Amino acid sequence: MSIVIPLGVDTAETSYLEMAAGSEPESVEASPVVVEKSNSYPHQLYTSSSHHSHSYIGLPYADHNYGARPPPTPPASPPPSVLISKNEVGIFTTPNFDETSSATTISTSEDGSYGTDVTRCICGFTHDDGYMICCDKCSVWQHIDCMGIDRQHIPDTYLCERCQPRNLDKERAVLLQRRKRENMSDGDTSATESGDEVPVELYTAFQHTPTSITLTASRVSKVNDKRRKKSGEKEQHISKCKKAFREGSRKSSRVKGSAPEIDPSSDGSNFGWETKIKAWMDRYEEANNNQYSEGVQREAQRIALRLGNGNDKKEMNKSDLNTNNLLFKPPVESHIQKNKKILKSAKDLPPDALIIEYRGKFMLREQFEANGYFFKRPYPFVLFYSKFHGLEMCVDARTFGNEARFIRRSCTPNAEVRHEIQDGTIHLYIYSIHSIPKGTEITIAFDFDYGNCKYKVDCACLKENPECPVLKRSSESMENINSGYETRRKKGKKDKDISKEKDTQNQNITLDCEGTTNKMKSPETKQRKLSPLRLSVSNNQEPDFIDDIEEKTPISNEVEMESEEQIAERKRKMTREERKMEAILQAFARLEKREKRREQALERISTAKTEVKTECKDTQIVSDAEVIQEQAKEENASKPTPAKVNRTKQRKSFSRSRTHIGQQRRRHRTVSMCSDIQPSSPDIEVTSQQNDIENTVLTIEPETETALAEIITETEVPALNKCPTKYPKTKKHLVNEWLSEKNEKTGKPSDGLSERPLRITTDPEVLATQLNSLPGLTYSPHVYSTPKHYIRFTSPFLSEKRRRKEPTENISGSCKKRWLKQALEEENSAILHRFNSPCQERSRSPAVNGENKSPLLLNDSCSLPDLTTPLKKRRFYQLLDSVYSETSTPTPSPYATPTHTDITPMDPSFATPPRIKSDDETCRNGYKPIYSPVTPVTPGTPGNTMHFENISSPESSPEIKRRTYSQEGYDRSSTMLTLGPFRNSNLTELGLQEIKTIGYTSPRSRTEVNRQCPGEKEPVSDLQLGLDAVEPTALHKTLETPAHDRAEPNSQLDSTHSGRGTMYSSWVKSPDRTGVNFSVNSNLRDLTPSHQLEVGGGFRISESKCLMQDDTRGMFMETTVFCTSEDGLVSGFGRTVNDNLIDGNCTPQNPPQKKKVSLLEYRKRQREARKSGSKTENFPLISVSPHASGSLSNNGDGCASSNDNGEQVDHTASLPLPTPATVYNATSEETSNNCPVKDATASEKNEPEVQWTASTSVEQVRERSYQRALLLSDHRKDKDSGGESPCVSCSPSHVQSSPSSHSNHIPQLQAKGPVPSFSELMEDPDPENPEPTTTNECPSPDTSQNTCKSPPKMSKPGSPGSVIPAQAHGKIFTKPDPQWDSTVSASEAENGVHLKTELQQKQLSNNNQALSKNHPPQTHVRNSSEQLSQKLPSVPTKLHCPPSPHLENPPKSSTPHTPVQHGYLSPKPPSQQLGSPYRPHHSQSPQVGTPQREPQRNFYPAAQNLPANTQQATSGTLFTQTPSGQSSATYSQFNQQSLNSTAPPPPPPPPPSSSYYQNQQPSANFQNYNQLKGSLSQQTVFTSGPNQALPGTTSQQTVPGHHVTPGHFLPSQNPTIHHQTAAAVVPPPPPPPPAPGPHLVQQPNSHQQHSVAHVVGPVHAVTPGSHIHSQTAGHHLPPPPPPPGPAPHHHPPPHPSTGLQGLQAQHQHVVNSAPPPPPPPPPSSVLASGHHTTSAQALHHPPHQGPPLFPSSAHPTVPPYPSQATHHTTLGPGPQHQPSGTGPHCPLPVTGPHLQPQGPNSIPTPTASGFCPHPGSVALPHGVQGPQQASPVPGQIPIHRAQVPPTFQNNYHGSGWH
């Protein structure tokens, strides 16, 4: 019933009434587009997510119960009536669909009998009414209308009334069918026909849009007594004008009706066709009045005004006529002749006698054609008229009209059409030319150029006139059928009619074409016959599937050769399967044709729209080569048509244009995700377009451009033009140059770009999410508000944002390309003339660039393409070679751009370091061109904010993905992953901006920024995190973010909304801003910005924060790559990460690196001094910490960059933990200030971290953003914590990044000096060697030690920390101890915080170790990390309580780990370092500990893992924290190897990798879950995992909750951890947290907060001891008891008993996506943890399989990845990424498979979507996670399972866990 499923999508129309998407009329409008997409290809079913309907997140059709029993369809009948009224009322909107629907119906009807199946219906009739559905059980065919099925909601699985007894309205059915039979025989009534249409619709299911249209139309016809005349026709007409594009979608549905209509025009020789044609002829809504499209009305009014009201002589007549319209009885009667209806005079008519008014839907010809009638199908009932003062209009009477529609064209007409104006509306009347005797057929002259028709034109003279030019030409035309598109354009009115019919009937006609057209093809085919080819083309378009399915005829070409009779027979004989196959084939053909059309349209559009588009196309061609070009053309082709039409077209075109179904699916997914965003689509679209143009996101560009074209045409042409002007210079030129160079230097990247773009563009969701997540995009509410189908186009980097900051417009979307280009230019010449000193190295970080050339690798990854010097390129090449550097070049650009953007907000902070500032000015100038993002940031705060978003967007955005894939699968992965957080960092960016401000005003600003930002950031973060998953939330957040983004600076200024201006100010505040921009960009790209940011500690941190998040996001993407790379090329990958990320950072970061070194001393001292409370210094420290984290990907890079490339890595590896400690310290000490903990950390731990910090500007930014989010959480929940939270946030973000980077770098770092640096930082010299040391945990341990040491140092600042550090050290080894310590520490809140930090740092170290999973020690490290995670959670728990107000809150956020990460930003620093810098920052914010894991995992899976990482990190953290076996859980997550054992046994190193990955995945899942869970209270998170997630998430949320109620959450946190551990099941409580919308907005924080809040009581109930118990015994479900407090959670813990089983079961469930496993949440926790581990492992392994995995990872891991991705996607990708930021989610998508595996995840992406509406998110996550999340735990687990399913499920399940 796949066809039916699409129908279900089609049901979107009905859905329109009944479904979420359907519920919004606009949605319906958009829906057709989406539907169309769906129509495009069967896959759309999944991707389409029917109409950006929010409810069906990942599902193709909102109305479908995928996997569920089809819901009863009785409402179908009533909805039609509703639709009918809607048709009548809003003909424009739904009616179109309805019309199409009815048309489609006929088409289906054409197929009539689907084989020899038995027909049995409650109506008692056995005729095929054209809308029949087959029982999946007994194969009985029934009338859809009789069975009460909503044509728009055709169930996926249908059972007849006997197989599924239910109440049906038999009387209504009988009435309907009787009427239909009459209609079929008389052809007079169409009401039944409409109904019939619906059944046809069923088979038209694939035509998502058509179906929707059909449904609506069907309903109208069905319900309305007007059915006879299908008011739908009129509606269709109007809708055509109003929404030509949509109509295009609908048209396929309509086509069905149209085909029969056409049939009447042409001789349908087939008997079947004859009946159907009769039905078609009769099935139209009688039009008593005309419907006018806005375009026609506007034009007519314009002409009328010009002429004057009475100008038209016929106006009066018209008035008279109109007055008599209803009374006037036309002297004609319709007769059926040769299977077609003709109009004959009922009496002798004198010349110039009014015969009849031609009624229907009036629209402009271009609107009609825009609907997609490219393939010249005859549109028998469309009248073209151009005599009205040259106004080219047409009247579409196919579904809505009167008898005049039957008037045929003839070479010897006896009547003509004349227009009259009445009441200001134009009317067309048929007047006799000469006397017409009674019984003579009324004919009119051809209103179209039949000579250009590619089908056989039917002439009314028929063969009576042997000299008939039409007949002669007609015989030839059959041969030319194939050139449908050209014909469509060339044809005259009729041709247009045909073309229009084609598009509208592209879907409908497709069916019709096969049947009707084919039949019409008989030698006798008349002028209106559709040529088979045309039909085929149409079929290939939307209706293809349906047509094929319905008609099941081979494709039109074949049909062409057969007589209509034969065709009909073949159709009848074809089985449904055959028909389906045919439909699919046709769909493919359609796609190809669509591409062709698109290209043509592109040509038109390029000229019509803006040169920029052409440039864009060129750029695309250059950069993406043919693929992109094709896409661009396709999309552009759509653009030329009216905006509305364009959208549909674009949609269709996009779907079709994507030749690869996978791509299409992605696109659909993206569309679905973005669907919510479409409301403001115009602006966004334009922005998107511009961004695309700039970004050279080839695919995205085309899509965006297409969508934008529409929007631009409508609204944003000016902006577009503006942008284009710049773009041509910067983007086109630079990009072209860059691309060419890139191709030369990195041949792969270019290809990757080409391919990536498709991938990116393909997944509208991804695009939307990415774009939305992107810093630049964050602000754009349009993205969220605009329909998803629009989003797809706008998604890339909403150009609007760019427009807003026009100066920055270039940066955001173009930033990447520009940077890349500039990087190439720099390589060739100096990096942009403007980039004087830094330019050469990496325009991104001016000063840093000059200083750090090593970081070029990172730059390479991120900004290498732009500012990469030859060296960098070389490195990049190496990286590419070793690590799929394909994406490297592209990645750089995206990252760079986002990074810059992020940094821009922090620039002020960074400004502190003169370096950046100096170069900043230069950079700013140079960078401006180099990457718009930098400049845009400067241009205006909004721009900046936008820029941030945009920049972030680029990273996350398809483009970035594209690049990542193309150029640096790994780096990109990291970068992308990092960006994910960065994107998440939209909030982060806000945070960044705040941070920047903070940089200026380190203490207050920081806190405020953190605090303010948290709210904003949280939304942004959430948005970014949940952006993909939860578009709505994302929207809100995005909206919030824009304000917040801008408010960040304001936040600094304490003015949230002023933020924009302020932000801009912040950015612009100091030249640094630009430098920062570069830094940020670098950071985004890699951690370069971090380096630059490093210049100013605060700034750095700020940047770190941003970077952290953005980087996290990007990093996730990149990390996935990294993970893959690391496993295969640990060194290479590490180096890639190191070099690329580091280099990317290094360009900006290297100088900071040097500075870092000196900064190390400097900051060490400062830290010592800061311990007093210098936030700024702390921030840098944090920044360093983040940077270390940033080392991971972007942040990690930043960190690494800061150090040396090698050192960077080391720092990243080593420092990440310290950084967290630092962050934690800042947080801890700075409970209220965010400074103390940081200071403490800074002083001891951050000494090296200071270097780190310097290099971690991005991390800092990220951290800040994170902290801000946390602070927001804190503000919301615990203002006390709020202040610290931001700091922590920053640090954690960085830490997160670091871990990711670390994991990549760790191999190198472990061997490198960074560890020493870390050692310096840390008192322990072991940091580097900690790998062996359990406590230190390998090199990671180095970090761990650093962390520990840092904590001690922190301890120095804060005495408690000292003890805790020791504890942490011990704890690392003894998981229970740490937890117990944590518990013990609980009393010493501050110590706890410090300890937590230490622990987290240790964890980070562990994570880092884990990150260096390649090393057996790393396994140990991982285990250690896990322990750390657990310990950290313990400590965090402890810490949480004490620092409750500020530090605690953040720590709490992270509760065990999550708290550390999230609420525990301070503690999270280690975690962050540990975790994915990206996710942790956002998503993982809550999961500090988890982040470690996540980074580890992320490393390999990078994209997936990163997101997963974060989630998993969180999860891990949660796991660690939550289950007593948390360590195990974490481990599990980390390493199933040491699933249960607390000890960090390094099971098999590979497993660690896998485990790591898995852990990461779980983490990611968890994180996602955490976030989702957080949102959902993480109820769904596996008990263990969920528990963690739940409690953990709860912890995370608790952290937020802590923020809210630090005290509460403190206890809560422990309990939360416990909950996680024991009572992940507490899902119930978690859901309440979702209730907190604001928090939810904060998603990472918010979710945590919610969770925490929810679990607060329970959490409190759970004692640290119990929590510890949970942690300790967490693995064993026994711990559940300990968390009595969190009874809700607690009882899930019992499930934990079920625990492993439950988890496994749950996981399996997850795979099954059954949420039943909720009960086993605790085991889930453990299991989740373990599961995740396994999942991670499974996933991890694929990623591990090779650096290639990232891109490959996405694909190679697709099995695993899908597991993971699925996990992620479901849990991790969607939620996880969503938590981290949809960005990572996007990055996930970047890993095509990843995203794709997310299929379900797509739905989880919906989780992300569901995520967006945090409150709803919880529900949505549930929803998203669907059943999985429905049950808190099951949902989560399901997600995990879903994600893991391929690999994880099996690996994990089979092996991992147990």
From Swiss-Prot:
Biased composition, class Low complexity, residue ranges: 887-901, 933-957, 1285-1303, 1349-1362
Chain positions with Phosphoserine modification: S623, S837, S845, S1070, S1273, S1359
Carbohydrate attachment residues: S435, T440
Domain of life (superkingdom): Eukaryota
InterPro entries: KMT2E_SET, SET_dom, SET_dom_sf, Zinc_finger_PHD-type_CS, Znf_FYVE_PHD, Znf_PHD, Znf_PHD-finger, Znf_RING/FYVE/PHD
Gene Ontology annotations of biological process type: epigenetic regulation of gene expression; erythrocyte differentiation; neutrophil activation; neutrophil mediated immunity; positive regulation of DNA-templated transcription; positive regulation of G1/S transition of mitotic cell cycle; regulation of DNA-templated transcription
Transmembrane segments: none
Role: Associates with chromatin regions downstream of transcriptional start sites of active genes and thus regulates gene transcription. Chromatin interaction is mediated via the binding to tri-methylated histone H3 at 'Lys-4' (H3K4me3). Key regulator of hematopoiesis involved in terminal myeloid differentiation and in the regulation of hematopoietic stem cell (HSCs) self-renewal by a mechanism that involves DNA methylation.
Name of the protein in question: Inactive histone-lysine N-methyltransferase 2E
Species per Swiss-Prot/TrEMBL record: Homo sapiens (Human)
Lineage start: Eukaryota, Metazoa, Chordata, Craniata, Vertebrata
